[in-house]
Amino acid sequence: MFWTRYAGASILLFFMLIRLGQLYPRNDMNNFGCEECKLKENNIFSKPGAPVYQCMGCCFSRAYPTPLRSKKTMLVPKNITSEATCCVAKEVKRVLVNDVKLVNHTDCHCSTCYYHKS
């Protein structure tokens, strides 16, 4: 008799948890608070009739334990390996705004993070 109640309560709890999970929106919580990689107007350098755009937004990054065979080949062994892609300009156009040479981004994509390279 006890096991029947226990099994029934477990099944009821399971279905309640499934229902609760369905109430939340199905968006990617990894990028919460960070928009996708796209062009946005730069308010500092833009002038009326001459907007200046730059790439802004998030791409992916992850970290994981370094495999032992990779660790053996490193000059300075590290326990954690990380990978990342950054929001960078795919195409650019050089412009002159108030005698300042600027690079106006015309297209964006997620690619290698150059500032991480050393």
Swiss-Prot record:
Q: What are the annotated glycosylation sites?
A: 79, 104
The protein's matches in InterPro entries, at most eight in alphabetical order, are given as: Cystine-knot_cytokine (IPR029034), Glyco_hormone (IPR000476)
Q: Which UniProt keywords apply?
A: Disulfide bond, Glycoprotein, Hormone, Secreted, Signal
Q: Which Cys pairs are S-S linked?
A: 34-58, 37-87, 55-108, 59-110, 86-113
* One GO biological process term: thyroid hormone generation
Spell out the GO cellular component terms annotated for this protein, sorted alphabetically and separated by semicolons: extracellular space; follicle-stimulating hormone complex
Q: Determine if Phosphoprotein is one of this entry's keywords.
A: no
Q: Where does this one sit in the cell?
A: Secreted
Instruction: Cite the GO molecular-function annotations of the record.
Output: follicle-stimulating hormone activity; protein heterodimerization activity
Leader peptide range in chain numbering: 1-23
**Coiled coil segments of this chain:** none
SUBUNIT field: Heterodimer of an alpha and a beta chain.
Entry function: Involved in gametogenesis and steroidogenesis.
Q: Which PANTHER family match?
A: GLYCOPROTEIN HORMONE ALPHA CHAIN (PTHR11509), GLYCOPROTEIN HORMONES ALPHA CHAIN (PTHR11509:SF0)
Q: Could you say which protein family the record assigns here?
A: Belongs to the glycoprotein hormones subunit alpha family.
The protein depicted here goes by the name Glycoprotein hormones alpha chain 1
Gene name of this polypeptide: cgaa
